Amino acid sequence: AFKRWEKQNGVEPRLPGIHLTHDQLFFLNYAQIWCGSMRPEDALSKVRSSVHSPGPIRVLGPLSNSYDFANAYKCSPGSRMNPLKKCSVW
């Protein structure tokens, strides 16, 4: 949807003092949603009892399998965030 909007309206200028592209800001915002910290024993308890993956997995899993993320951040092929073999749902 964002890319379609950009095509129709043009690319917005970057925010002053922010040295990230709009694509990078998109992924940064996604990651920040899942940002948090907890004590190791609480994390282990949550992993054992919750049906949902912990925040870091919700970020690293999808983004490391995203070609768009790898392009936005210029991740080297074969790196942790741009593995050569990716899992694709669609």
Where are these regions (language model features)?
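Zinc-dependent metallohydrolase catalytic domains
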Residues: 1-90
